[in-house]
A protein has these predicted regions:
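Hydrophobic or amphipathic alpha-helical targeting/insertion segments
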Residues: 88, 140-163
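N-terminal beta-propeller domains
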Residues: 1-116, 174-232
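A fold-level detector for beta-propeller and closely related beta-sheet-rich head/sensor domains
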Residues: 71-72, 148-149, 168
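Asp-box/WD-like beta-propeller blade repeats and closely related beta-sheet repeat scaffolds
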Residues: 126-129, 158-179
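Tryptophan-centric aromatic hotspots in well-structured domains and transmembrane helices
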Residues: 61, 134, 154-155
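Beta-sandwich interaction modules
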Residues: 119-138
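Short, charge-rich binding segments
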Residues: 133-138, 144-146, 176-179
Length: 232
C-alpha cells in the first residue's frame, strides 16, 4: 500500500527535528514549485574574462528595466557585469590603488629611536595596513561604492559605457557605504572618524549638509572601537 506524502513547502527551523515532524528541516540549492521540492536551475558563466587582481566586494541587483547588474570591486579596479553586455571596467579616475595582502608596519623608522632598552624584547604591538575591501550597494538603479584604501564614495549611474564618479558632496576618508530601504545613503567611519555614521537627505544622495528642510545628519557611536561594517 502506498501512502501519499504531503509535505508542506519550506524549511522548518524554529524548533527541534522532533517538533518539525512532517516538515522539511534542511536543504540546499532547491526550490518549491506547485508545492513540490525541485532542484534549482544550473549555473551559467557570466564572463570568461579573469580579473588581474583579487576581488574584494560584490553586489548584484536589478535595474528599473529588470536588467541584471553585478558590481565587483577588486584591489585596484571596479567592474560591472550588465545583462547583455560583457565585463565593463568602470574604475573611477584617480582611485587609490589598494593592497592584495595586509602589510606590517615594522620597517626602519616605524618606532622612536631609543624607545626601548638595548637587549630587551620588544612588545608585540606592531601596526598593520589591512587588505583593501569594498562595500557596494544600490541607490535605485545606480550603484554606490567605496574602497577602504581610497575612502571616497563613488556612484555608477547604470551606464556600462561610463565609469563611476565621486558622489557630489559626500564625506571622504570613509570606512564603508550602504543604502537603507528608506533611500538614505549612509557613510560608515565618515570623514575619517572611525565611530561616525553620516547620512544624506532622503532620496537625495548629493545633499549631506543638515538643514531644517532636509533629513541629512550624523551621529557618533558611543564606543572606543572602530566601525567596520553595517547592515540595514
Amino acid at each position: 500500500m502506498l501512502i501519499k506524502l504531503e509535505i508542506p513547502p519550506g524549511l522548518y527551523k524554529n524548533g527541534t527535528e522532533y517538533q518539525a515532524a512532517g516538515r522539511w528541516t534542511d536543504a540546499n540549492l532547491v526550490r518549491w514549485f506547485e508545492n513540490t521540492l525541485r532542484p534549482i536551475g544550473g549555473w551559467q558563466t557570466m564572463s570568461s574574462t579573469q580579473f588581474n587582481d583579487v576581488a574584494r566586494g560584490m553586489h548584484g541587483y536589478f535595474d528599473n528595466s529588470n536588467n541584471r547588474r553585478v558590481i565587483v570591486g577588486t584591489t585596484s579596479n571596479l567592474y560591472v557585469y550588465a545583462e547583455g553586455v560583457s565585463q565593463s571596467n568602470i574604475t573611477p579616475s584617480g582611485i587609490v590603488t589598494g593592497r592584495n595582502d595586509a602589510a606590517s608596519q615594522i620597517g626602519y623608522g616605524a618606532q622612536l629611536y631609543g624607545e626601548h632598552a638595548y637587549g630587551v624584547a620588544r612588545p608585540d604591538n606592531e601596526q598593520y595596513d589591512p587588505v583593501t575591501t569594498w562595500t557596494i550597494d544600490n541607490f535605485g538603479e545606480d550603484a554606490v561604492c567605496s574602497a577602504t584604501t581610497d575612502g571616497k564614495i563613488y556612484i555608477w549611474e547604470n551606464n556600462p559605457s561610463a565609469v563611476a564618479t565621486v558622489l557630489t558632496n559626500a564625506p571622504t576618508s570613509n570606512q564603508g557605504v550602504l543604502v537603507t530601504d528608506e533611500r538614505f545613503v549612509m557613510c560608515l567611519g565618515a570623514g575619517g572618524n572611525p565611530r561616525k555614521v553620516q547620512w544624506s537627505d532622503q532620496e537625495a544622495a548629493t545633499v549631506w549638509t543638515p538643514a531644517s528642510t532636509n533629513a541629512a545628519g550624523s551621529l557618533e557611536v558611543a564606543s572606543d572601537g572602530k566601525i567596520r561594517a553595517g547592515i540595514v
